[in-house]
Amino acid sequence: MASILNRAMLHGGDYNPDQWLSSPDILARDIELMKQAHVNCVSLAIFAWSALEPEEGVYTFDWLQNVIDRLYENGIYTVLATPSGARPAWMAQKYPEVLRVDETLHRNHYGDRHNHCYTSPIYREKVWEMDSRLSKAFGNHPGVILWHISNEYSGACYCPLCQEEFRHFLKEKYKTLDALNAAYWTGFWSHTYTDWSQIEAPVPRGEMLLHGLSVDWHRFVTQRTVDFFNWEKAAVRAGGSELPVTTNLMSFYYDLDYTKFADSLDLVSWDSYPSWRTDPRGDVAVAIHTAMAHDYMRSLKRQPFLLMENTPNQVNWKQINRLKAPGQNLLAAMQAVAHGSNSVQYFQWRQ
């Protein structure tokens, strides 16, 4: 049934029924409301790791099976996510090395979302196990049409493992320290490197003035992130599913080079949250910027894309969060479609 991606406009959004398992009547109510709203697709399990594996090695997929089945019986398809964007507390407690080291070179405590190291062997092992199990369980379900790999990849880790991978990245690029020193012009201020182990990522309390180092670090962060995406994609394939894969990008997110994701994605999707009625430049400028973002997403693979997230009302992270004006939600949806989106999806269905 993956062909629905090519023969229908997807309408729906993120749905997190794992938050409402204590109230089973909510699912029936939500399905009825979805049908009234002509919803034909929802994204599931994006932040559901703790509900899917409440304890290490204890997998509870029954609730997800029930939700996917019930939705499909009512003509609603599932974009199934891998939940790597937010790991459970038990994992951070037992394996603190999965947590990121920030640019002050301190390891983070548990919390937030993208607070995990893409290089950590343990985190990769846990992600592989989860993703491949989800693929085996649901990857060939007739109601599942697309894999939503992780969520809004972002950020960087400065742990010793990532630092060593960065040095390997530089060795692959420059081959010799002489070539690297020449490219970075390290003779200025006597910053010449004499051993690969001396090279560290640019940080506030370390080297910040070698522009070549900073550019290469950002390129490395993109490479690490794409590598992790491909790791998740391989896990899904190992579980037996050949459904297309995507991940939700974030407009002009300058910390990652999205053009490097294009070859790994089967289709592009992104999350659009314009500052309607809030940006001091005015809504015309916001609309122009959003139009350019839509065009950028279409350009990545030179094909239609999916609007994976937007809000029907207002965002909640600005100092001032104004509601959209009457008719503005429809206008934003039509703008996305006009620029090549094959979907209008929202975050989130219930909150």
Task: Give the label of every model feature segment.
Residues 7-11, 38-40, 72-78, 140-145, ...:
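Short, well-ordered coil/turn segments that N-cap beta-strands
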Residues 104-267, 271-292:
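Polysaccharide-binding and catalytic clefts of secreted carbohydrate-active enzymes
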Residues 2-24:
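Boundary/entry segment of secreted carbohydrate-active catalytic domains
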Residues 109, 246-351:
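Hydrophobic targeting/anchoring helices
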